[in-house]
Regions:
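Conserved small-residue-rich beta-alpha loop and adjacent elements
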Residues: 126-191
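N-terminal Rossmann-like NAD(P)+-binding subdomain of aldehyde/semialdehyde dehydrogenases
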Residues: 1-150
Length: 191
């Protein structure tokens, strides 16, 4: 029988934290998949860790994301979606294995839906959405003439906190993409 340390080292990290965030306490969730039992690992964070993480996310956002153009962010989101549209992308293959086991959805449905859903995040679709919602996506970068005769610039929140649905995959992706497009950092957790 593996020791706790071996169990943790074999676990799949189902989280992402910025570099420099020190976490020493993890939870392990075991899920039975078509490829055997998989151990999913996520950090256990107390209030002070979450507060520190939120401050760090805002700091990194202010130094990086806030200075990027909306076109650069569009390209990054679209490139990520393109990776996820590829059935050979390792993280997608992992998702296709884990999502049915966690949600009870049929594997074929998950595979088809991942491909279909990722199409919404192509550059053309994202730009079309921004155009329909705010008119001038460049107003996220700089002051631009507005309809009233003055100048306006759209400013998104520095940080959003999102609780992700645990049983309906994909829903958080839209919120995360939109938050990134308005140059906001994201602190999220699964429900």
């Amino acid at each position: 029988m593996p020791t706790v340390d071996e169990s943790v080292s074999q676990a799949i990290d189902v989280f992402h934290l910025p570099s420099g965030v020190d976490v020493s306490d993890y939870e392990i969730y075991e899920v039975a998949t078509s490829d055997g039992v998989k151990r999913l690992r996520y950090p256990r964070l107390d209030g002070s860790k979450v507060t520190s993480l939120a401050k760090q996310l805002v700091d990194v956002r202010n130094r990086t994301l806030a200075a990027m153009s909306v076109n650069d962010i569009l390209d990054i989101v679209a490139d990520a979606a393109q990776l996820w549209a590829d059935p050979d992308f390792e993280l997608r293959r992992q998702a296709e294995l884990l999502i049915p086991a966690i949600t009870g959805y049929e594997p074929d449905m998950v595979r088809i839906e991942l491909k279909r859903y990722m199409r919404q995040f192509r550059r053309r679709e994202l730009l079309r959405f921004l155009d329909s919602e705010i008119g001038q996506p460049s107003m996220l970068d700089e002051f631009r003439p507005n309809k009233a005769g003055g100048y306006s610039k759209y400013v998104g929140p520095a940080l959003t906190y999102q609780v992700f649905s645990s049983n309906v995959p994909g829903i958080p992706v839209w919120s995360m993409a939109m938050t990134l497009l308005v140059k906001g950092a994201i602190l999220g957790k699964s429900s």
